[in-house]
């Protein structure tokens, strides 16, 4: 079974490493047929990227003819490209997809999955929400239950900043510390303004509740220096059948999300049967890569 790896940054390199290290029986026949980045196309599987051909991901798709696309490329929230068009082309050819790229799903979840169902194509996307912590794949093992609402802390950067602010650190100093530790980007806008969490709750709302929403339908607020100082604040993402939103809210000590601190993420899923809480690391290249690898194994087991 041949993979086309789209993207070879930290997540792509971590995925390749895990694929070689975690040789479960399901992975014995899996090979990386090629890797494509902005620099070109490598038609082999090796640690150091050296392009063999010029060209983009569409040329790589045509040349390599993969069985599965693994998309670990960076997100383009303007229009989801080139991943969105790549997914459509892959689905039409019956090629399965594994992705850690939130943008196409946040912009066109139902369009993508409707097309995939019509062609019998499987899509694994655990790495888009909470990385390797099985938020998406937890839902796959809840057959027969109906999700009524979901709420959670879905952005590790803002949760780390809010944890420090709760200890009396200023917003500016907390952000600097997050950047120093590598939790926040040099430009942290998409984390700080709530957009990243909004993209994730969009994916969850469509997948778990059956909503028909895009990131453009979600109301979101971020965090700033003006948040109340005398209460513990968390950036909460919420969805039910009627609304999807993200905003900072005070949280009480008896709330299951109260002690979710640092870069940890958590998701509370309320069904018509029970309420389930899952928590764990929500970021980091190895965690995201493991999310993709777990999807690959589940795909091989015919469990996606």
Curated annotation (Swiss-Prot):
Subunit organization: Homodimer.
PROSITE patterns xrefs: HOMOSER_DHGENASE
Keyword Amino-acid biosynthesis appears in the UniProt entry: yes
Binding site for L-homoserine: 185, 196
pH dependence: Optimum pH is 9.
Source organism (scientific name): Sulfurisphaera tokodaii (strain DSM 16993 / JCM 10545 / NBRC 100140 / 7) (Sulfolobus tokodaii)
EC number from the UniProt entry: 1.1.1.3
One Gene Ontology term of the molecular function aspect: homoserine dehydrogenase activity
Single GO biological process annotation from the record: methionine biosynthetic process
UniProt pathway annotation: Amino-acid biosynthesis; L-methionine biosynthesis via de novo pathway; L-homoserine from L-aspartate: step 3/3; Amino-acid biosynthesis; L-threonine biosynthesis; L-threonine from L-aspartate: step 3/5
Family that this chain belongs to: Belongs to the homoserine dehydrogenase family.
Activity: how regulated: Inhibited by cysteine.
Cofactor: binding comment: A sodium ion is seen in the structure; a metal ion may subtly affect the relative position of the nucleotide-binding region to influence enzyme activity, and could increase the stability of the enzyme.
Reactions catalysed according to its record: L-homoserine + NADP(+) = L-aspartate 4-semialdehyde + NADPH + H(+); L-homoserine + NAD(+) = L-aspartate 4-semialdehyde + NADH + H(+)
Protein keywords: Amino-acid biosynthesis, Disulfide bond, Metal-binding, Methionine biosynthesis, NAD, NADP, Nucleotide-binding, Oxidoreductase, Sodium, Threonine biosynthesis
PTM summary: The enzyme is activated by reductive cleavage of the interchain disulfide bond between the two subunits.
Positions with a binding annotation for NADPH: 8, 11, 38, 73-74, 100, 102, 284
Entry protein name: Homoserine dehydrogenase
PANTHER family, per database record: HOMOSERINE DEHYDROGENASE (PTHR43331:SF1)
Gene transcribed to yield this protein: hom
């Amino acid at each position: 079974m041949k993979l086309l790896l789209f993207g070879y940054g930290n997540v792509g390199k971590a995925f390749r490493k895990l694929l070689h290290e975690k040789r479960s029986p399901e992975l014995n026949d899996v090979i990386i047929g090629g890797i494509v980045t902005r620099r070109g196309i490598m038609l082999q599987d090796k640690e150091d990227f050296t392009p063999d051909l010029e060209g983009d991901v569409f040329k790589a798709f045509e040349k390599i003819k993969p069985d599965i696309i693994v998309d670990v490329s960076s997100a383009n929230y303007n229009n989801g490209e080139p991943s969105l068009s790549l997914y459509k082309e892959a689905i039409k050819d019956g090629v399965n997809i594994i992705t850690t790229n939130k943008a196409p799903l946040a912009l066109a979840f139902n369009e993508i999955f409707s097309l995939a169902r019509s062609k019998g194509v499987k899509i694994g996307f655990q790495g888009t929400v909470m990385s390797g912590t099985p938020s998406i794949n937890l839902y796959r093992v809840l057959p027969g239950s109906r999700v009524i609402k979901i709420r959670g802390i879905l952005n590790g950067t803002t949760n780390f900043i809010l944890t420090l602010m709760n200890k009396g650190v200023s917003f500016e100093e907390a952000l600097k510390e997050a950047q120093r530790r590598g939790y926040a980007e040099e430009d942290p806008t998409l984390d700080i303004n709530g957009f990243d969490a909004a993209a994730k709750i969009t994916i969850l709302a469509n997948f778990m509740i059956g909503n028909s929403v895009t990131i453009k339908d979600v109301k979101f607020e971020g965090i700033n220096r003006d948040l109340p100082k005398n209460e513990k604040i968390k950036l909460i993402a919420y969805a039910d059948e009627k609304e999807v939103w993200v905003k900072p809210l005070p949280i009480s000590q008896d709330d299951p999300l109260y002690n979710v601190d640092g870069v940890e993420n958590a998701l509370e899923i309320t069904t018509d049967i029970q309420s389930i809480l899952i928590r764990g690391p929500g970021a980091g290249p190895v965690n995201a890569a493991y999310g993709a690898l777990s999807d690959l194994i589940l795909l091989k087991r015919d469990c996606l």
